[in-house]
A protein has these predicted regions:
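Gram-positive cell-envelope targeting signals
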Residues: 1-27
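Beta-rich carbohydrate-recognition modules and glycan-binding surfaces
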Residues: 25-224, 228-231
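Long, low-complexity, intrinsically disordered segments
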Residues: 235-240
């Protein structure tokens, strides 16, 4: 709550006026997510086992790589082996650098990952590729629900080169109705539409990014309100 200082009743009456107060914009967050063919992954931010609030983000801010529950499968990462993963199995918690993004208005944004050894699990494709966000999904809108925002003009960028463009991406309505959050899908081998049209382009060796445009958020912001104010709130209190 904004604190106001007053300069005395008589002076206050002389300088009384109004102050237009703009409602603060809501800030949301977006994260890249993926699963490789051998199931190395970064899950959605709100995942109950590997999300950002689990173990202070230990798993979410890394890449989970399976290795047959054997710490010697990838000897160069033996010190990263965790034999007590959240689901009870053992795997590698491999460091990576993620670019997550805050969204507070309509515009174009980018999320991504670098500093990961993409050749480690010998994969060449994705089971899943997505952007998970905490932008609300209205499960009561229409038959399948809908996000409060629209996503468009998406680009998948591999090693600095645009390898796919998606003008109108698929929103995961099934997940949205369960989680209340918006997830944007680019690959999902278990989704009928994406089996055919999902991402099947180049596989990263250095970096993976997803660029996307968000619209409709500005319309969600509350209108400015007008509140009364008295005096100059930047001056010190001179009451005695």
């Amino acid at each position: 709550m904004k604190m106001r200082r007053f300069i005395g009743a008589a002076a206050a009456m002389a300088v009384a006026g109004t102050l237009t107060v703009g409602a603060a914009a809501e800030t949301y967050n977006a994260y890249i997510g993926f699963q490789t063919a051998p199931y190395s992954f970064r899950n959605s931010f709100d995942d109950a086992s590997y999300g950002k609030d689990v173990a202070d983000g230990k798993y979410f801010n890394s890449v989970i790589v399976w290795g047959g529950n054997d710490p010697e499968t990838f000897p160069q990462y033996e010190d990263k082996f965790d034999d007590d993963m959240p689901d009870g199995s053992g795997g590698y918690v491999i460091p990576a650098t993620y670019t997550d993004v805050q969204i507070d208005k309509d515009g174009t944004y980018k999320v991504g990952i670098t500093d990961f050894d993409w050749a480690l699990d010998s994969s060449s494709s994705f089971n899943l590729l997505f952007v998970s966000t905490d932008i609300p999904f209205n499960k009561d809108a229409g038959e399948d629900g809908e996000s409060i925002a629209k996503f468009s003009d998406c680009k998948i960028i591999v090693d600095g080169t645009v390898t796919s463009e998606v003008a109108d991406p698929i929103i995961d309505t099934e997940d949205g109705k369960k989680s209340g959050h918006t997830k944007v899908l680019f690959a999902n081998i278990w989704n009928d539409a994406l089996k055919k049209d999902g991402y099947n382009g180049a596989y990263p060796t250095k970096s993976l990014e997803i660029e996307f445009t968000v619209s409709g958020l500005d319309a969600q912001q509350p209108a400015d309100t007008t509140a009364p104010t008295t005096g100059d709130s930047t001056k010190p209190n001179t009451n005695t």
